[in-house]
Amino acid sequence: ISNDLHENALKAATAKGSETTPYNLSNNTGGNTVENTANCYVVNAPGYYSLPLVYGNAIKNSATNASAYTSTVTGTNILNPFINHAGNGITDPYIANNNGCTPAKAELVWQDAMNLVTDIKYNADSNGGNISFKVDRSSIRQGNAVIAIKDVSDAILWSWHVWVTDEDINDVIEITNHQNVKYN
């Protein structure tokens, strides 16, 4: 047993998802609907997880959030639309629905704790599918990993940061600034 309070809290947490039904990190309850996507997902328990193949936060409240990959600002130094790995403009939140983007496999790019994230898989399905992975109870600890979706030529189409921590990111903490203004 570890003397690390954070590691012990993670190991004691109730596991989420299963190998056949991973916990969807883009859904507040782990359900199938893609609600809110991100470039970084927080994991706070062992289990099986999945994330949709979406560019960053391009889905918000279950709808397309085009402001995540386009801009209403004009000028010579404005990238509009944002471009993908191949230099093509991003036209759709779902990676597979963009020109030259055909997901083929998911891989670990790096992790800062051994065996933090394992069993990484690309699962083909509607809208390009998803990536699933496991965070094992025996090796869970605070740490970070980057997982990528690649095409058949090993080009990275997009990547996501996975942060494993026992911190409750939904816990609202009131902060008071120097001017005595309170923020939640």
Which residues fall in each region the model found?
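Extracellular/luminal low-complexity segments enriched in Ser/Thr/Pro
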Residues: 126-142
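Solvent-exposed, low-complexity, repeat-rich "mucin-like" stalks and linkers
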Residues: 1-116, 173-184
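A short beta-strand micro-motif common to beta-rich folds, especially ectodomain repeats
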Residues: 141-152
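Ligand-binding face of N-terminal immunoglobulin V-set domains in extracellular IgSF glycoproteins
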Residues: 108-113, 118-124, 131-132
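Short, exposed coil/turn segments at beta-strand boundaries within extracellular/luminal domains
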Residues: 153-160
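Short beta-strand edge segments in extracellular beta-sheet folds
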Residues: 161-171
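Residue-level detector of short, conserved catalytic/binding motifs and their immediate flanks
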Residues: 145, 160, 183
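A structural detector for beta-sheet-dominated domains
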Residues: 44, 52-54, 134-136, 150, ...
